[in-house]
């Protein structure tokens, strides 16, 4: 059985004033409030979502 790698991301900029699709991506990653941290599986799908909103988040 293999262990799944995880990635931690933190919301460092408010999504107010951004595109609706970017706000939906932030919610899809499990981020709600500013400086909230979410730990997710490191998959190509999650990496793509992080890349889309890279100006809003920081990878820890």
UniProtKB/Swiss-Prot annotation:
Alphabetical list of Pfam families matching this protein: Ribosomal_L30 (PF00327)
Record's keyword terms, sorted: Ribonucleoprotein, Ribosomal protein
GO terms, molecular function: structural constituent of ribosome
Cross-referenced Gene3D superfamilies: Ribosomal protein L30, ferredoxin-like fold domain (3.30.1390.20)
BP GO terms, sorted: translation
Annotated SUPFAM superfamilies: Ribosomal protein L30p/L7e
Keyword Iron-sulfur belongs to the record: no
HAMAP family: Ribosomal_uL30_B (MF_01371_B)
Family designation: Belongs to the universal ribosomal protein uL30 family.
Database matches in PANTHER family: LARGE RIBOSOMAL SUBUNIT PROTEIN UL30M, MITOCHONDRIAL RIBOSOMAL PROTEIN L30
Quaternary state and interactors: Part of the 50S ribosomal subunit.
Protein's name according to its UniProt entry: Large ribosomal subunit protein uL30
Source lineage: Bacteria, Pseudomonadati, Pseudomonadota, Betaproteobacteria, Burkholderiales
């Amino acid at each position: 059985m293999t262990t799944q790698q995880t990635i931690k991301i933190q919301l460092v900029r408010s999504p107010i004033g951004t595109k609706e699709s970017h706000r939906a991506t932030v919610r899809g990653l499990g981020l709600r409030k500013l400086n909230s941290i979410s730990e997710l599986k490191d998959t190509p799908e999650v990496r793509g979502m992080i890349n889309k909103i890279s100006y809003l988040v920081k990878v820890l």
